[in-house]
């Protein structure tokens, strides 16, 4: 690649998304220089950290909100197929990084683990049965098993069935090809790889404090060393903001028009963590249920086996806790400083339209450990207070925006990618399934922000993600070959 193709790129945030974007960009050309800035002292400390999320490899195997019951009673599985395909793209990327020796020991960040859906009550059982009948016809999900038999459920989830009173209608489905992903460990491996690259400069304890676009389209990015308070200005052709909850404030500082009519509502995640090894070893699955009627998708309860630092552990949640910080290590002024003249009507409209979400958040805020334990006992009837501790995990900032389809103050559940008009800046906002589908974000960055350089990056992408540009949904043979290859590269056949 000629010197004329030289680019300076700034990546803000060294979480799973930022390190994934930087890793792919670093491979495209030695003439693309990447300055990467993380405000904390290391990579993957905020939402990507293994203690700050449930570690689900989101592939729509057990998450019921990706399969929607239609008015005629049929099940729409298109979103589930989309999420599954996106996770397969991420698996290809990770697997080829391992295969090429860029990162090592995949068992330190990904483990095979059954994914189970579990519901109670006739309405939910009927839904799960119909979901099973739909998914079993789709190649991506055709290994799914279903049961309404308590003895079978006892084999799948012995801890959850122990001393459970008979008489309640229950059902479960299971897919054995699920995974537990330690996104913190993966992020640190990607960061270590980037630290060795000659065309990457990764600096910790450096905070991006201002962004200004010049008349020539380039960006002036002001960065402050949080230890010395020294400020420097970097000139960038492209800027990617993957700073978790801090992305909205940075987008606002950039001055792009996409910042208007957009805001965020911060919510902390809380989990109950089991402290009794004898209990932990009785459960080996991720079990997702259905959100309570009238509650938002974030309220879906799940019981998660986790593998952290080589040890098996067990989490239940999430519970929510509201507060003004946009980051776990943020400021109590974050929410208030994000309310501007150009988004205040959006925020007010959201407050009016989303009373159930606000009520849920307040209910969660005042919930004690006793209340959390009572909810856990719907999953584990014999759960004892002394075996569990309640802790605060990561922050999520629910994106609030105006849209033609939903009107003013619409709350976005999921990941939102925002591009400037000239595609020189891209920001990732929102929440799950972001980490699992990180490679899809990488591809969107390349396709939108680097469209003129496709000749340079497309061969690299096809090497790292061989199915790029092809459909795993419509090509069963390709899907099965890809799964076999990624399972081998990631050492999942164990």
From Swiss-Prot:
Top-level EC class: oxidoreductase
Keywords: FAD, Flavoprotein, Oxidoreductase, Tricarboxylic acid cycle
GO biological process terms held by the UniProt record: tricarboxylic acid cycle
Molecular function, one GO term: 2-hydroxyglutarate dehydrogenase activity
InterPro entries xref list: FAD/NAD-bd_sf, MQO
SUPFAM superfamilies associated with the record: FAD/NAD(P)-binding domain
EC nos: 1.1.5.4
Cofactor(s) needed: FAD
Pathway stated in the Swiss-Prot or TrEMBL entry: Carbohydrate metabolism; tricarboxylic acid cycle; oxaloacetate from (S)-malate (quinone route): step 1/1
Catalytic activity reported: (S)-malate + a quinone = a quinol + oxaloacetate
HAMAP family: MQO (MF_00212)
Listed NCBIfam families: Lac_Quin_Ox_NO, mal_quin_oxido, PRK05257.2-1, PRK05257.3-2, PRK13339.1
Family statement: Belongs to the MQO family.
Listed name of the protein: Probable malate:quinone oxidoreductase 3
Organism: Staphylococcus epidermidis (strain ATCC 35984 / DSM 28319 / BCRC 17069 / CCUG 31568 / BM 3577 / RP62A)
Gene for this chain: mqo3
């Amino acid at each position: 690649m000629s010197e004329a193709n030289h680019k300076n790129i700034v990546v803000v945030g060294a979480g799973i998304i930022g390190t994934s974007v930087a890793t792919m960009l670093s491979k495209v050309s030695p003439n693309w220089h990447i300055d990467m800035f993380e405000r904390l002292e290391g990579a993957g400390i905020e939402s990507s950290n293994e203690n700050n999320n449930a570690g689900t490899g989101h592939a729509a195997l057990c998450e019921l909100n990706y399969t929607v019951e239609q008015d005629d009673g049929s099940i729409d599985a298109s979103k589930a197929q989309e999420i599954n395909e996106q996770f397969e793209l991420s698996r290809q990327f990770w697997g080829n990084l391992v295969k090429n020796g860029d990162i090592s020991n995949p068992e330190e960040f990904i483990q095979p683990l059954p994914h189970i859906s579990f519901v109670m009550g006739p309405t939910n059982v009927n839904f799960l049965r119909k979901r099973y009948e739909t998914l079993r016809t789709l190649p991506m999900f055709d290994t799914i098993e279903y049961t309404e038999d308590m003895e079978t459920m006892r084999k799948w989830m012995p801890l959850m069935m122990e001393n459970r009173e008979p008489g309640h209608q229950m059902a479960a489905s299971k897919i054995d090809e699920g995974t537990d992903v330690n996104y913190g460990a993966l992020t640190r491996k990607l960061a270590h790889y980037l630290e060795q690259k000659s065309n990457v400069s990764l600096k910790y304890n450096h905070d991006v404090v201002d962004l200004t676009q010049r008349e020539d389209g380039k960006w002036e990015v002001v960065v402050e060393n949080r230890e010395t308070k020294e400020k420097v200005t970097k000139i960038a052709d492209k800027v990617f903001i993957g700073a978790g909850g801090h992305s909205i404030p940075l987008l606002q500082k950039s001055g792009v028009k996409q910042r208007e009519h957009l805001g965020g509502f911060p919510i902390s995640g809380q989990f109950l963590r089991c402290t009794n090894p004898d209990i932990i070893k009785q459960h080996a699955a991720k079990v997702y249920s259905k959100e309570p009627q009238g509650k938002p998708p974030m309220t879906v309860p799940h019981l998660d086996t986790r593998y952290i630092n080589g040890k098996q552990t067990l989490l239940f949640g999430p519970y929510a806790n509201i507060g003004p910080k946009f980051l776990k290590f943020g400021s109590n002024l974050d929410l208030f400083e994000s309310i501007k003249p150009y988004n205040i009507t959006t925020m007010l409209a959201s407050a009016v339209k989303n009373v159930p979400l606000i009520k849920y958040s307040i209910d969660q805020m005042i919930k004690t450990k006793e209340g959390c334990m009572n909810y856990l006992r719907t999953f584990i009837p014999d759960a004892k207070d002394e075996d569990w501790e309640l802790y605060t995990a990561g922050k999520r900032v629910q994106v609030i925006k105006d849209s033609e389809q939903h009107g003013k103050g619409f709350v976005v559940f999921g990941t939102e990618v925002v591009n400037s008009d000239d595609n020189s800046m891209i920001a990732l906002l929102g929440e799950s399934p972001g980490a699992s589908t990180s490679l899809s974000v990488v591809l969107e960055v390349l396709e939108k922000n680097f469209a003129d350089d496709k000749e340079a990056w497309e061969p690299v992408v096809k090497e790292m993600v061989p199915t790029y540009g092809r459909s795993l949904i419509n090509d069963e043979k390709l899907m099965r070959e890809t799964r076999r290859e990624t399972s081998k590269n990631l050492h999942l056949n164990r």
